[in-house]
């Protein structure tokens, strides 16, 4: 089935409105990187809630060469926003680990900024009127687990969680976003490598596999392995069901 972004919009915006209502929220809080995902989510939020109810947060880690994209995006959408540099917070944690006799691994250094960003977004959300953090991940990233648990995978709900990277771009175009925000190559912000460099295959390959089942066998094996080993990132926190009662409901009904 051919993807029609215009037909998708009405249902998606209605769903976003329902999710915000269920959360008891008013202000959509979004981390702004200036790439296709955060730009498209921000544009969707403006369409769903009105720009006065969308708050963008720019979260550079020290000197960020592409921060101009983030600034240009919030100016284009004319949404309230702020900039909070997470460098000192990230370095503070790493330094305290060193003092405790712990040597941070490379993976720690890669994932910590994402978790600090999410903690900051929630701090901002709790400071604003009924602030709700909206997730900006897409299906392609999530399918291969290219996200940080309790970092960029977090949020109250995920508007793009069932859209591939190419479908996100199509949605962004229908929403009138300038092309520069949609074609900006995503990177981890630390190594200088793009997501696709780190993955070892393209998002297009993931998209073709997810939507059409078409994939080179060698790449399919890589995708399947990453998908299989990353499912824990998206599961509700497992709880041991001990059979004891909670009021009139069993513990099994807790989650």
Task: State each model region's role.
Residues 41-49:
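Conserved SAM-binding loop of SAM-dependent methyltransferases across substrates and taxa
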Residues 91-92:
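Glycine/proline-rich, positively charged
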Residues 38-42, 67-71:
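Short, surface-exposed alpha-helical segments at coil->helix boundaries
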Residues 115, 119:
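Catalytic-core regions of hydrolytic enzymes
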Residues 1-28, 52-55, 62, 71-86, ...:
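ATP/NTP-dependent adenylation/nucleotidyl-transfer catalytic domains that generate, transfer
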Residues 35:
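Conserved G/P- and acidic residue-centered "switch" motifs that form tight phosphate/ATP-binding loops
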């Amino acid at each position: 089935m051919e993807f029609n972004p215009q037909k998708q919009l009405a249902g998606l915006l209605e769903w976003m409105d329902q999710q915000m209502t269920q959360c008891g929220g008013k202000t959509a809080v979004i981390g702004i990187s200036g790439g296709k995902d955060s730009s498209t989510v921000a544009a969707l939020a403006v369409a769903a809630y009105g720009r006065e109810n969308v708050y963008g947060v720019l979260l550079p880690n020290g000197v960020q060469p592409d921060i101009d994209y983030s600034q240009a995006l919030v100016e284009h959408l004319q949404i309230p926003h702020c900039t909070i540099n997470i460098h000192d917070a990230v370095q503070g944690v790493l330094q305290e680990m060193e003092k405790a006799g712990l040597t941070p691994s490379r993976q720690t250094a890669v994932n910590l900024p994402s978790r600090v960003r999410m903690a900051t977004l929630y701090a901002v959300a709790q400071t604003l009127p009924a602030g709700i953090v909206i997730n900006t991940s897409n299906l392609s990233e999530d399918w291969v687990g290219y996200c940080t648990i309790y970092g960029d995978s977090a949020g109250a709900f995920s508007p793009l969680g069932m859209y591939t990277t190419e479908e996100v771009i199509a949605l962004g175009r229908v929403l009138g976003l300038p092309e520069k925000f949609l074609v900006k190559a995503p990177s981890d912000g630390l190594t200088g490598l793009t997501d696709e460099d780190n993955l070892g295959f393209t998002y297009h390959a993931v998209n073709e596999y997810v939507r059409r089942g078409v994939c080179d066998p060698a790449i399919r094996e890589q995708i399947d392995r990453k998908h299989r080993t990353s499912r824990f990132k998206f599961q509700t926190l497992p709880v041991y069901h001990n059979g004891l009662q909670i009021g009139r409901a069993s513990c099994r009904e807790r989650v």
